[in-house]
Amino acid sequence: MLEITGTVAKREMKSQLLDDMELERERGITIKLTPVRMQYKGYTLNLIDTPGHVDFSYEVSRSLQAVEGAILVVDATQGIQAQTLANVYLALEQDLHIIPVINKIDLPASDVPRVTAEIVNLLGCDESEIIKVSAKTGENVDYGLDAIIERVPAPTKTASDETCALIFDSYFDDYRGVIIYVRMFSGKLPKNANIRMMATGSNDIALEVGVLNPKMSPRDELQDGEIGYIVTNLKATREAKVGDTVTLVKAPAHAALPGYKNVRPFVYAGFFPVSNDQYKDLKEALEKLSLSDSALQYEPENSPVLGFGLRIGFLGLLHMDIIRERLEREFGLDLIVTNPSTDYHVVLTTGEEIDIRSASDLPDITRVAEIREPWAKGEIITPKEYIGSILELIVSKRGVQKNISYIDTRAVIDFDAPMANLLTDFYDQLKSATSGYASFNYELGGYHAEDLVRIDFLVAGERIDALSVMAHRSEADAIGREVTKKLKQVIPRQNFEVALQAAIGARIISRETLGAYRKDVTVKIHTGDRDRKAKLVEKQKRGKARMKRFGKVDIPSEAFTVMLKRD
């Protein structure tokens, strides 16, 4: 589209042009959304390239509120995926005009008739409305541009003169501060105007305003209906949150645009530097990343075993993986990341309710009246022949099947399951059970009171708080046995015997023993000197007993990720 409209010269074109981050290019995904303005046949088109992954669905929903139509791109080799459904529902909620496009028709593995039938089934559209393109060769892409002009309405002009602009993204520039992307819904926003963020109450100056072509192009003002950027003097994106409304200080709008909500993380993990000297560097690195990622939340955490670190909240596992990789690559940090967990609502015997984000934070069980765990609403799209194995997998995760519907040759399975059971290896097991053909999407459903316990893991009698995990009582024994076996594989043998135990309170539910190295202390003694041999063996026994009492076991970083690789 950028090439056909002349927005970017052919010599400057490259794949994933709008994906600026190195990680985006490497993984072939969009992590941050990107707006761009194009001119075509006398019309101005504002395109927003959005991430498709469930972790970033709030950003997608905000950007959908900034536009009048959406191009739904479906891979001709893959067909409709679970996240396709999620994003279609978001677009339909906003009453957007959807233009269905099948891409990659040039590939030998493409199955255009099947994917066409799936889209017709999903949207209820006519087959003639679906545009079949190859983004690689450019075939039929101009039909997509024509369809935007024909089917997507122009922004409606409002009678109000109040300045109202929706923030649909923001990022931190090292040299210029916070830059926000906005859609103007009414009024005008001139350069150097005093502006206010209505949800946070922050006041600032619009140092520069303009549009993106896709590079920044300064203008004197932004007008009703336009999509553009504002360079502010703010020092953190949390002061200009996605979904907030920008207005003028001198003539503020009477009401903010609808739909703003605080993004709440539901996956938490402890990040600890391998060297304690790097704790300050970790904190500074996260401060920098959070300037451009308002969804990132963190607080200090102190572990007796791992030392000082941070407990960080994420929107999902992909979000966590991206942040971990950026910390290691961009800031050169060597990290130990503990098992991801979710937050639990704990009702105390006094009636007080508290939230815990780590199993080690659970109060003494005598003070706990009830523990509520988050449940997810999940959706799986799969070829029909895998329905049986998927239902078995859902039941094994304490899930409940709610509904099965069909899109042409594939089934859509709706189910509820505990969020914690989807955070470990559910996705890998799903891919394995369906030979990689199923796709999976989920969202937070609510909190249910369950019979939960905390499993602690002890190494040589010492509780390793970073390994503690919440589990349903019915699953606790199996988890304890499995994890102690895994720990035996990853913790190196010592000069003394080491007990690896799983416990619920004071009750040991599983034990593995890591055998000691055997050093032959009699090797240099003459074979006939039995008394001397016996003395040396006895001395070795006493030494090992002393080491067992006072010896410290070094636990490798792999031990803290064993929960992610459960069978």
Q: How would you name each of these model-derived features?
A:
Residues 1-567:
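Structural and coupling elements of P-loop NTPases
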